[in-house]
Amino acid sequence: MRLPNGLYAAGLDADSDDAAGHTHEGIYYLWNQDLITDALGTDEAEWLRPLVHLEPCNDNGLGTLQLRGRVEWERINADMDTLLEARGRRSAPARDEKAITVWNAMLIDGLVEAGMILREWSWVEQARELADSLWTAHWDDSMALRTSFHDRPGVPAVCEDYAWVALSFAGLAGATGESVWLDHAVEVLGEAVARFSAVDGSFLDAENSFLLTVTAHTLTDDACPSPTAAMVMALRRVGLMAKRADFIERANKASRGPTSSGVSNAAIRRLGPGRLPHY
Protein backbone atom coordinates (compact mmCIF):
# COMPACT_ATOMS: atom_id res chain seq x y z
CA MET A 1 0.00 0.00 0.00
CA ARG A 2 2.98 2.33 0.37
CA LEU A 3 3.57 4.75 -2.47
CA PRO A 4 6.99 5.84 -3.78
CA ASN A 5 6.70 9.19 -1.95
CA GLY A 6 6.23 7.44 1.40
CA LEU A 7 2.49 8.00 1.73
CA TYR A 8 -0.07 5.21 1.69
CA ALA A 9 -2.54 4.59 -1.12
CA ALA A 10 -6.25 5.00 -0.52
CA GLY A 11 -7.21 1.38 -1.06
CA LEU A 12 -7.40 -1.77 -3.13
CA ASP A 13 -10.28 -2.76 -5.36
CA ALA A 14 -12.54 -5.46 -3.94
CA ASP A 15 -12.78 -7.23 -7.31
CA SER A 16 -10.14 -9.09 -9.30
CA ASP A 17 -10.01 -11.83 -11.94
CA ASP A 18 -9.77 -15.56 -11.31
CA ALA A 19 -7.61 -17.93 -13.36
CA ALA A 20 -10.28 -18.05 -16.06
CA GLY A 21 -10.49 -14.29 -16.33
CA HIS A 22 -13.83 -13.97 -14.54
CA THR A 23 -14.19 -11.15 -12.03
CA HIS A 24 -15.15 -11.93 -8.44
CA GLU A 25 -15.21 -9.96 -5.24
CA GLY A 26 -12.39 -10.95 -2.88
CA ILE A 27 -11.13 -13.78 -5.09
CA TYR A 28 -7.50 -12.70 -4.67
CA TYR A 29 -7.55 -13.55 -0.95
CA LEU A 30 -9.60 -16.77 -0.90
CA TRP A 31 -8.69 -20.47 -0.82
CA ASN A 32 -10.16 -23.95 -0.92
CA GLN A 33 -8.51 -27.30 -0.22
CA ASP A 34 -7.72 -27.94 -3.88
CA LEU A 35 -5.88 -24.63 -4.21
CA ILE A 36 -3.93 -25.33 -1.02
CA THR A 37 -2.96 -28.77 -2.34
CA ASP A 38 -1.82 -27.27 -5.65
CA ALA A 39 0.45 -24.86 -3.76
CA LEU A 40 1.80 -27.12 -1.00
CA GLY A 41 1.51 -30.65 -2.34
CA THR A 42 -0.73 -33.41 -1.01
CA ASP A 43 1.19 -34.35 2.15
CA GLU A 44 1.71 -30.82 3.42
CA ALA A 45 -1.85 -29.80 2.55
CA GLU A 46 -3.19 -32.74 4.56
CA TRP A 47 -1.00 -31.77 7.52
CA LEU A 48 -2.33 -28.23 7.33
CA ARG A 49 -6.00 -29.20 6.89
CA PRO A 50 -6.92 -29.65 10.60
CA LEU A 51 -5.03 -26.49 11.57
CA VAL A 52 -6.96 -24.07 9.37
CA HIS A 53 -10.67 -23.48 9.28
CA LEU A 54 -11.94 -22.69 5.80
CA GLU A 55 -15.12 -20.66 6.16
CA PRO A 56 -16.75 -20.48 2.70
CA CYS A 57 -17.38 -16.91 1.61
CA ASN A 58 -19.06 -17.60 -1.72
CA ASP A 59 -20.85 -20.25 -3.80
CA ASN A 60 -17.54 -21.69 -5.04
CA GLY A 61 -16.59 -22.93 -1.58
CA LEU A 62 -13.73 -20.46 -1.33
CA GLY A 63 -12.90 -18.90 2.01
CA THR A 64 -10.26 -17.37 4.24
CA LEU A 65 -7.74 -19.36 6.27
CA GLN A 66 -8.29 -19.16 10.02
CA LEU A 67 -5.82 -20.88 12.32
CA ARG A 68 -7.14 -23.01 15.14
CA GLY A 69 -5.61 -25.31 17.73
CA ARG A 70 -1.97 -25.59 18.67
CA VAL A 71 0.45 -25.25 15.79
CA GLU A 72 4.11 -25.71 14.97
CA TRP A 73 4.89 -22.12 14.16
CA GLU A 74 8.08 -22.72 12.21
CA ARG A 75 6.40 -25.22 9.90
CA ILE A 76 3.17 -23.32 9.48
CA ASN A 77 5.02 -20.06 8.80
CA ALA A 78 6.88 -21.82 5.99
CA ASP A 79 3.55 -23.01 4.57
CA MET A 80 2.10 -19.51 4.80
CA ASP A 81 5.11 -18.14 2.92
CA THR A 82 4.50 -20.69 0.17
CA LEU A 83 0.81 -19.82 -0.02
CA LEU A 84 1.65 -16.12 -0.10
CA GLU A 85 4.02 -16.74 -3.00
CA ALA A 86 1.28 -18.67 -4.82
CA ARG A 87 -1.20 -15.87 -4.19
CA GLY A 88 1.28 -13.41 -5.65
CA ARG A 89 0.89 -15.16 -9.01
CA ARG A 90 -2.83 -14.38 -9.09
CA SER A 91 -4.33 -11.35 -10.78
CA ALA A 92 -4.03 -8.68 -8.10
CA PRO A 93 -6.79 -6.14 -7.46
CA ALA A 94 -6.21 -2.63 -8.76
CA ARG A 95 -4.86 -0.03 -6.35
CA ASP A 96 -6.33 3.43 -5.88
CA GLU A 97 -3.07 5.37 -5.83
CA LYS A 98 -4.29 8.68 -4.52
CA ALA A 99 -3.07 9.58 -1.04
CA ILE A 100 -5.67 11.01 1.35
CA THR A 101 -4.41 13.19 4.19
CA VAL A 102 -6.87 12.15 6.89
CA TRP A 103 -6.35 8.42 6.29
CA ASN A 104 -2.57 8.75 6.39
CA ALA A 105 -2.84 10.81 9.57
CA MET A 106 -5.09 8.20 11.17
CA LEU A 107 -2.51 5.57 10.25
CA ILE A 108 0.19 7.62 11.97
CA ASP A 109 -1.94 7.83 15.09
CA GLY A 110 -2.66 4.10 15.01
CA LEU A 111 0.98 3.15 14.52
CA VAL A 112 2.06 5.36 17.42
CA GLU A 113 -0.61 4.06 19.78
CA ALA A 114 -0.09 0.40 18.87
CA GLY A 115 3.68 0.76 18.95
CA MET A 116 3.63 2.28 22.42
CA ILE A 117 1.18 -0.26 23.83
CA LEU A 118 2.87 -3.31 22.30
CA ARG A 119 6.41 -1.92 22.57
CA GLU A 120 6.92 -2.31 18.82
CA TRP A 121 9.25 0.63 18.37
CA SER A 122 9.63 -0.04 14.65
CA TRP A 123 5.97 0.97 14.28
CA VAL A 124 6.68 4.30 15.93
CA GLU A 125 9.57 4.80 13.52
CA GLN A 126 7.27 3.97 10.60
CA ALA A 127 4.84 6.58 11.93
CA ARG A 128 7.64 9.15 12.06
CA GLU A 129 8.67 8.39 8.47
CA LEU A 130 5.06 8.64 7.31
CA ALA A 131 4.57 11.93 9.15
CA ASP A 132 7.66 13.35 7.47
CA SER A 133 6.35 12.27 4.06
CA LEU A 134 2.90 13.70 4.76
CA TRP A 135 4.28 17.04 5.91
CA THR A 136 6.52 17.29 2.86
CA ALA A 137 3.91 16.26 0.31
CA HIS A 138 0.68 17.76 1.67
CA TRP A 139 1.58 20.95 3.57
CA ASP A 140 2.57 24.22 1.93
CA ASP A 141 2.85 27.24 4.22
CA SER A 142 -0.61 27.57 5.77
CA MET A 143 -2.51 25.44 3.24
CA ALA A 144 -2.89 21.67 3.37
CA LEU A 145 -3.88 19.30 0.59
CA ARG A 146 -6.57 16.70 1.03
CA THR A 147 -5.28 14.46 -1.75
CA SER A 148 -2.44 13.91 -4.14
CA PHE A 149 -2.06 11.52 -7.05
CA HIS A 150 1.38 10.50 -8.28
CA ASP A 151 2.80 13.60 -6.58
CA ARG A 152 0.29 15.88 -8.32
CA PRO A 153 -1.62 18.05 -5.81
CA GLY A 154 -5.34 17.49 -5.48
CA VAL A 155 -8.09 19.44 -3.74
CA PRO A 156 -7.54 21.55 -0.60
CA ALA A 157 -7.85 19.87 2.77
CA VAL A 158 -11.05 19.95 4.80
CA CYS A 159 -11.52 20.11 8.56
CA GLU A 160 -10.97 16.42 9.32
CA ASP A 161 -7.62 16.48 7.48
CA TYR A 162 -6.30 19.32 9.64
CA ALA A 163 -7.68 17.78 12.83
CA TRP A 164 -6.16 14.35 12.33
CA VAL A 165 -2.79 15.72 11.24
CA ALA A 166 -2.63 17.80 14.43
CA LEU A 167 -3.85 14.91 16.59
CA SER A 168 -1.43 12.38 15.13
CA PHE A 169 1.56 14.72 15.10
CA ALA A 170 1.02 15.55 18.77
CA GLY A 171 0.87 11.85 19.58
CA LEU A 172 4.08 11.31 17.63
CA ALA A 173 5.75 14.12 19.58
CA GLY A 174 4.79 12.42 22.82
CA ALA A 175 6.13 9.06 21.66
CA THR A 176 9.43 10.28 20.21
CA GLY A 177 10.18 13.37 22.30
CA GLU A 178 10.75 15.32 19.07
CA SER A 179 9.26 18.77 19.64
CA VAL A 180 9.12 19.56 15.93
CA TRP A 181 5.99 17.41 15.63
CA LEU A 182 4.24 19.34 18.37
CA ASP A 183 5.25 22.59 16.65
CA HIS A 184 3.70 21.31 13.43
CA ALA A 185 0.56 20.25 15.33
CA VAL A 186 0.16 23.72 16.83
CA GLU A 187 0.59 25.33 13.41
CA VAL A 188 -1.92 23.03 11.72
CA LEU A 189 -4.47 23.31 14.51
CA GLY A 190 -4.27 27.10 14.54
CA GLU A 191 -5.09 27.12 10.84
CA ALA A 192 -7.97 24.71 11.39
CA VAL A 193 -9.57 26.89 14.07
CA ALA A 194 -9.27 29.94 11.83
CA ARG A 195 -10.68 28.21 8.76
CA PHE A 196 -13.45 25.97 10.04
CA SER A 197 -14.98 27.52 13.17
CA ALA A 198 -18.79 27.65 13.09
CA VAL A 199 -20.90 30.31 14.79
CA ASP A 200 -22.31 27.77 17.27
CA GLY A 201 -18.84 26.80 18.48
CA SER A 202 -18.55 23.54 16.56
CA PHE A 203 -16.64 23.13 13.29
CA LEU A 204 -17.65 23.16 9.64
CA ASP A 205 -16.71 20.24 7.41
CA ALA A 206 -15.08 22.61 4.89
CA GLU A 207 -14.41 26.31 4.49
CA ASN A 208 -17.19 28.68 3.54
CA SER A 209 -17.24 29.36 -0.18
CA PHE A 210 -19.31 31.55 -2.44
CA LEU A 211 -19.87 28.39 -4.50
CA LEU A 212 -21.80 26.77 -1.63
CA THR A 213 -25.33 27.79 -0.66
CA VAL A 214 -25.06 25.70 2.52
CA THR A 215 -21.84 24.62 4.21
CA ALA A 216 -21.86 21.05 5.47
CA HIS A 217 -21.85 20.76 9.23
CA THR A 218 -21.56 17.13 10.36
CA LEU A 219 -21.75 16.04 13.99
CA THR A 220 -22.37 12.33 13.43
CA ASP A 221 -19.68 9.72 12.83
CA ASP A 222 -19.42 7.97 9.49
CA ALA A 223 -16.38 6.25 7.96
CA CYS A 224 -14.35 8.69 10.04
CA PRO A 225 -15.29 10.46 13.28
CA SER A 226 -17.09 13.75 12.74
CA PRO A 227 -14.89 16.80 12.11
CA THR A 228 -16.04 18.38 15.37
CA ALA A 229 -15.15 15.23 17.32
CA ALA A 230 -11.70 15.11 15.73
CA MET A 231 -11.15 18.80 16.44
CA VAL A 232 -12.15 18.43 20.10
CA MET A 233 -9.69 15.56 20.52
CA ALA A 234 -6.93 17.45 18.73
CA LEU A 235 -7.51 20.69 20.63
CA ARG A 236 -7.46 18.86 23.93
CA ARG A 237 -4.31 16.86 23.19
CA VAL A 238 -2.34 19.69 21.62
CA GLY A 239 -3.59 22.20 24.19
CA LEU A 240 -2.37 20.09 27.09
CA MET A 241 0.96 19.21 25.50
CA ALA A 242 1.73 22.72 24.25
CA LYS A 243 0.22 24.47 27.29
CA ARG A 244 -2.20 26.34 25.05
CA ALA A 245 -5.14 27.32 27.25
CA ASP A 246 -6.88 28.85 24.21
CA PHE A 247 -7.00 25.46 22.50
CA ILE A 248 -8.45 23.80 25.59
CA GLU A 249 -11.09 26.52 25.94
CA ARG A 250 -11.94 26.10 22.24
CA ALA A 251 -12.42 22.37 22.84
CA ASN A 252 -14.74 23.17 25.74
CA LYS A 253 -16.76 25.51 23.54
CA ALA A 254 -17.08 22.93 20.77
CA SER A 255 -18.12 20.24 23.24
CA ARG A 256 -21.38 22.02 24.06
CA GLY A 257 -22.91 21.20 20.70
CA PRO A 258 -22.70 17.51 19.65
CA THR A 259 -25.88 15.51 20.02
CA SER A 260 -25.53 12.20 18.19
CA SER A 261 -21.87 11.30 17.69
CA GLY A 262 -20.23 8.55 19.66
CA VAL A 263 -16.73 9.90 19.13
CA SER A 264 -17.83 13.44 19.89
CA ASN A 265 -19.26 12.36 23.21
CA ALA A 266 -16.17 10.29 23.98
CA ALA A 267 -14.07 13.37 23.24
CA ILE A 268 -16.24 15.44 25.58
CA ARG A 269 -15.78 12.96 28.41
CA ARG A 270 -12.02 13.31 28.05
CA LEU A 271 -12.41 16.97 28.96
CA GLY A 272 -13.16 15.96 32.52
CA PRO A 273 -15.93 16.53 35.08
CA GLY A 274 -18.18 19.50 34.58
CA ARG A 275 -17.58 19.69 30.83
CA LEU A 276 -20.50 17.55 29.66
CA PRO A 277 -23.12 19.48 27.69
CA HIS A 278 -26.55 20.10 29.19
CA TYR A 279 -29.61 19.69 27.00
Label each region the model flagged:
Residues 1-279:
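Glycan-recognition and catalytic cores of secretory/periplasmic carbohydrate-active enzymes
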